[in-house]
Amino acid sequence: MNDILAKILAVKAEEVATARQMRSEAELLREAQARQDVRGFAQAIEDKISQGKAGVIAEIKKASPSKGVLRENFDPAEIAASYAMHGAACLSVLTDVQFFQGSHDNLRRARAACSLPVLRKDFIIDPYQIISARAMGADCVLLIVAALAPAQLRDLETLAIDLGMDVLVEVHDAKELDAALALRTPLIGINNRNLRTFETTLQTTLDLLPMIPAGKRVVTESGILKPEDVRLMREHDVQAFLVGEAFMRANDPGVELARLVA
């Protein structure tokens, strides 16, 4: 595990411990189970693709550790509405505070502004965070193979599914892909950014594609910056995209989405 990821995960452990003191897991679970408003995340992607369109998971994030602040004029509800208007299949909302300047409230506001399913984008290491995701309205959670042992992956996935959510499992290489393919989720996110060097290459997705069986939906993540990137991926039958930076830097994120997948 690289230093940046290890640092983030240490902060997450502290955050979970603090949150548990503020509110018990049992109480949070009651709130999560009481919500009957799950929007089908994986299905929304498939619906777009079945229409011959790209299945775009459009991301809402103010900043990142590697790039700093991406967007000064940051209104999650306004961005979400623009994404919905311009053809996004789903939203991804950063809820990490320290490294990405996100928040739980950003997710709530984005979800309330449209009818799209929403991914809680965070570094999940504990069941408490899965329960919290559903309680705040998330329809899908991200599990990062690099951050979790195989038993943790299975247990967290099972909990998410039991709460009605979908799971996007993220990999960076062939070894991580093996762990991801052992899970039930059809959503396999391939992150094109090297966790050690932070360099990005779309070749990562292309290299892993032959190892992925039918019945799984590949989501290519990071480095999708221009229409040619989308065309390259779709030529290789990669039809789902998680895009953040390109949209966040644009004057109108939704208009940029439409331009990217035109």
Curated annotation (Swiss-Prot):
Report the enzyme's class at the first EC level: lyase
Q: In which pathway does it act?
A: Amino-acid biosynthesis; L-tryptophan biosynthesis; L-tryptophan from chorismate: step 4/5
Can you name this protein?
Indole-3-glycerol phosphate synthase
Highest taxon of the lineage: Bacteria
E.C. number, please? 4.1.1.48
| PROSITE patterns named in the record | IGPS
- UniProt entry tagged with the keyword Amino-acid biosynthesis: yes
Q: Which family does it belong to?
A: Belongs to the TrpC family.
The record lists the catalysed reaction(s) as: 1-(2-carboxyphenylamino)-1-deoxy-D-ribulose 5-phosphate + H(+) = (1S,2R)-1-C-(indol-3-yl)glycerol 3-phosphate + CO2 + H2O
Biological process GO annotation list?
L-tryptophan biosynthetic process
UniProt keywords, alphabetically: Amino-acid biosynthesis, Aromatic amino acid biosynthesis, Decarboxylase, Lyase, Tryptophan biosynthesis
